[in-house]
């Protein structure tokens, strides 16, 4: 019974189950499964049948765990051949002892260790790669989140700025301050003498130019206020009893061309319209707005009241200072002037608000004093 054999370049014959090792005239067979050395092919065949249950080409799977070097076998054979040649020269055939090679598992253990180390390195490399990918993904998410927050903050700041601008524009457009810049004016000597005699404050009025004497006023009078909104108010005053001279004087005052032009940001308020319309009511002896001592009247219950004697106003005040503030409505006087832009105001609070908005001045309200002449 034969075996399929392949002769290699290094004088080794390999089969599927064993290795044929040649040395001179002798050879031996090494079992690949258990590394046992056998002398003949019959012994090898019987060995693989009995020990490894090999039946007609069906064998168990095995792995080669060791390698044999032919140089060691040849060195051992050469040593034994030299020894026998020095003996009897008549001997033609010499039996060469078999080189006994015992398989050790060191080579297989080293291979297994190297494979384990290689697998561990691969696993570690894969873990590091996964960690790097996770870190990059987390960084990308953080960057996207920061960009979203920055965008939201920018939108909020822009909306707040737009709201502030709208609010400031609304406030500036809804202001009801009336600015008048009259020239330097003085009161007539008669009014100054009367004010000095009554120890009252002299308020300078707008310059009243010489008025032409109009014809007698009709029953229905029309008063036109020269304002920025060009509002014309008509009224029907009651029958006026008095001399023609007084009526003509009042009409001249109303229609005189020397009145200063009012610059208003909005239409005239109800109080201003009432003040303009009241100029054709029953006349008084004087157009001066100086509060006099004779305007105080005692009521039935003994309380003292100060009554506004400007034409037909007749409003009552408990304190004289309140009445003086009220008379400013009739006189159109502006005692509080802005030292930066020459704007004038009736009340100090309006001047304070103007200085805060227009000139960004704060904390100097105590320095605002009415202008005295």
From Swiss-Prot:
**In the record, which residues are listed under signal peptide?**
none
Low complexity: compositionally biased ranges: 121-140
Q: Name one GO cellular component term.
A: nucleus
PANTHER family reported in the protein's UniProt record: PR_SET DOMAIN 13, ZINC FINGER PROTEIN
- Cite the record's Basic and acidic residues compositional bias ranges: 110-119
**Name used for this protein in its record:** AT-rich binding protein
**Functional note:** May be a transcription factor for genes having (A+T) stretches in their promoter and/or enhancer regions. Binds to AT rich DNA.
Enumerate the residue ranges forming zinc fingers (C2H2-type): 29-52, 306-330, 336-359
Region annotation Disordered: residue ranges? 110-144
Gene3D superfamilies noted in UniProt: Classic Zinc Finger
Q: Does the keyword GTP-binding apply?
A: no
Fetch the InterPro entries from UniProt.
Answer: Znf_C2H2_sf, Znf_C2H2_type
Cellular location of this protein?
Nucleus
One of the entry's Gene Ontology molecular-function terms is: zinc ion binding
Q: Does the keyword Repeat apply?
A: yes
Biological processes annotated in GO: regulation of transcription by RNA polymerase II
- As recorded in UniProt, coiled-coil segments are none
Give the keywords, sorted: DNA-binding, Metal-binding, Nucleus, Repeat, Transcription, Transcription regulation, Zinc, Zinc-finger
Determine the domain of life of the protein's source: Eukaryota
